[in-house]
Every structure is written in C-alpha cells, then in structure tokens.
Amino acid sequence: MFRQLKKNLVATLIAAMTIGQVAPAFADSADTLPDMGTSAGSTLSIGQEMQMGDYYVRQLRGSAPLINDPLLTQYINSLGMRLVSHANSVKTPFHFFLINNDEINAFAFFGGNVVLHSALFRYSDNESQLASVMAHEISHVTQRHLARAMEDQQRNAPLTWVGALGSILLAMASPQAGMAALTGTLAGTRQGMISFTQQNEQEADRIGIQVLQRSGFDPQAMPTFLEKLLDQARYSSRPPEILLTHPLPESRLADARNRANQMRPMVVQSSEDFYLAKARTLGMYNSGRNQLTSDLLDEWAKGNVRQQRAAQYGRALQAMEANKYDEARKTLQPLLAAEPGNAWYLDLATDIDLGQNKANEAINRLKNARDLRTNPVLQLNLANAYLQGGQPQEAANILNRYTFNNKDDSNGWDLLAQAEAALNNRDQELAARAEGYALAGRLDQAISLLSSASSQVKLGSLQQARYDARIDQLRQLQERFKPYTKM
C-alpha cells in the first residue's frame, strides 16, 4: 500500500548529530574502560533528553526524506528492539527511522532515536553487518554521548553548543546552509571535538559489539563492516560520509577486530526479512536501483532458499514499479501461494491489485489474512484497499482504531483524513490532518486546523470539547518546545 504514500524529499541531518561527543562510562564485566561517572545528569535529565528527542523527531519528519514505509519501519524497529533488549543502561524508549539517502551513514540523538540511511542496506552483506551499525548507535544512546557532549560544550564553549543545535535544525530544512553554519560555529573548537568523537566511537564499538553478540549476531560483522568502509576510503577520491561523522582510525578497527576475536565464533544466517527488506529498499529507494538491483537478484537466485525467495520477490517488485502488473502478479503468485500470510507478499499483492483497479480482490485477501488483528502493516493495507475501492466508512472504522493505537504513525492519519474527506466529515478530516501536521512539528498549522474543526461542530458538544482539549495540549507542547525554537 505504500506506493500511494511514497514521498521524495531532500534534506540531511547527519554531521550535526555526531559533533563534540565525550566518552562516558559503561559498567560491564567484559569491558575494561574506566568508570567516568554520570556527570551528564547535571546537564540533562532523562526527561529533558526525551523532550528534546521528541522535538527533533518532529523536525525530522517535517524536513528530512524519511522512508515512511510500513514494512521497512516494522523491520528496522523489530531488529532494533532485539538489540535493545540485550543492551545495558537503557533509560529511554527506542525508535528507529530510515532516511532515503545513498550515502552510508547512521546517527543517534536524544531520547533513544536512531536514524539509518537506506544505503546501509546496499552495503550490508548480511543482517549481522546491518545490526552492527545499529548496535553501535544504540550504544551512543545508552552511554548518553550527546548529553555528555552538551555538558562539555556548555562548560567550555556554551555559545558554540547553542549555535550547533541551531545549525542542526537549519540543516534539516536547508542542508547546504545548515552545514555552512555548523562549519563556522565549530571552527574554533574542532580539534577538541574530533578527539572526543574518536573516543566515543571506540567506546560505542566496544559496547555495541557486546550487544551484537548477546543478541545472537556475529560479532565479527562489526570489524568486517568497518574494514569495508576503510577499503572504500582508500580506493576512492571521496570517503564514505559515515567516516566524516564517525572517525575511523586504524586503531579503532584493530580494537574492534581484537574484541571480536576474543568472542566465541558464531555462524549466523541472515533472516528472510533481511533479504526482503534489502530487495525492497534497493528496488524502491536506490537512485541507481535498476541495474544494481538486477545484478543482486541474479546473485541471490543462485544462493540459499531465503535468497532465492527474496530474488523472486524483488523481481515482482521491479515489475510492479514498472507498471507491468501481469508480470508482477505471475512472479509473486508462487510465493504468495506458499506463504499466504506473509506481510511482504500481501503488501505487494495489494499494490498490484490496486494498480489494476481490483480493490475487491485485495480486500478479500486481506480480510482473511491470519495476522490481520495483530499486524499494523496488514491493517493499513486493508484500510487503503477499502479507500481505493470506494468504501471509506470501512476504511475509517479500521483507521480510527489504528490511529488510537499508533498515534505517531503519519500513514494512519493521512489515510484517515482521506477517508473522512470521502465521507464529507469535514471536522474529522481537519482533525486527522492536524495530527499529521503536529507529528511534523508544524504545531501552528495543527492548532489552526483543530480550531476550524471545533468551529464546525455543535457548540458545547463533546466533540468540540475534545478538539479544544487537543488544542490546549498542543499549545502546552509549544511552550515546552520554545527553548529549542530560539536556538
């Protein structure tokens, strides 16, 4: 169903999020780093970190090229939470996001938010390598590196830190202007920041590799992936972007390799979901996707069973993207027949059906899906099929429940707004659109839409009270966010 919702935006948030980091402590029996205390607490509480994270996530949604694909979002969050469940010092909820960017990179920021570039799927040979990058970023969060960086900058150069935070936001809206501002702001203190960053990167490797191993992934994947990055830097005139934001001296690679060698060797097979996610990312979100994806699918077709199935899925996806619906259906059919409850296959089958104006076929298939009640991806697919099939009330029934349980999913609010518009429920359409604006950090517009919704219902009604209460909540949120909007 995501084909109808896909966006193509251009923005970046990368280098700003990894500046000025200071090495903290980690109390683990397998780690030999000294305990440097918890001094970040004197600058930011966990609650403040989460509030700042909420603010920046909203800016990210509103400005960055997020891949708001339900299947990929579900996959990276499932993989991420598997890693988080084996991490120590977890003090915040975690959320994982995917940005459409052909540069290899990832970053973590306040409140347990981790962002991956789509290029990581292209360069990760297996699931353990992708997980190694995520474990590294998770470790930045659990060690509170960014909070400690803020403390150090406030102590040594407070105006530099305030300027850097302002540049982060500017970089979201205008990458060139934002990075130019950031470069100027940091010019006077760059060398100290780089040394801190190197120390933090090495610590995130050391802790991340433990998380990786405890989660059942191959610890050798981390040094192997780092070595790939170094090789690319050696033989390219332009190093990978991740090396600009995550310093990688030879000593860091040697340390990661030494630590992995001390761990029990593991033979780990990548999950089928990894191959399907990689095929989907390359097939839909890679600028050079046609030839690159075809070459990879040819290779997978000769591989193990999981790779072969992913290759067939990728071929069907390619055909669908080219509007060759009959070919896509024929290619997908054996997979769907073998696994009729597979969400990846059901999602693609829905897109094929809707592309051929066969909404009723999609509806009947999805209504009988085994995991419909528990799988958000299938629920969104069914709601979208109802909407495309001219049954907006059925769609609204699903989406009202969905948005109640998934308040941070803009896909749900967008579809609900479409359904309410088709039903001529103007106030409810405005309210749903307001939630989408709020998620994207556009609180003024959200409040304006809710005010319009409130004016269209009966004076003194329960519905009006609900709209007015939501307006009050958003105004309170604006007040909490004011310190960040002034940076």
UniProtKB/Swiss-Prot annotation:
InterPro entries, per database record: Mito/Outer_Membr_Metalloprot, Peptidase_M48, Protease_BepA, TPR-like_helical_dom_sf
Organism expressing this protein natively: Escherichia coli O157:H7
Any single Gene Ontology cellular-component annotation: periplasmic space
Annotated binding of Zn(2+), by residue: 136, 140, 201
Localization, UniProt: Periplasm
Protein name: Beta-barrel assembly-enhancing protease
Pfam (any one): Peptidase_M48
Enzyme class (EC, first level): hydrolase
Keyword NADP: no
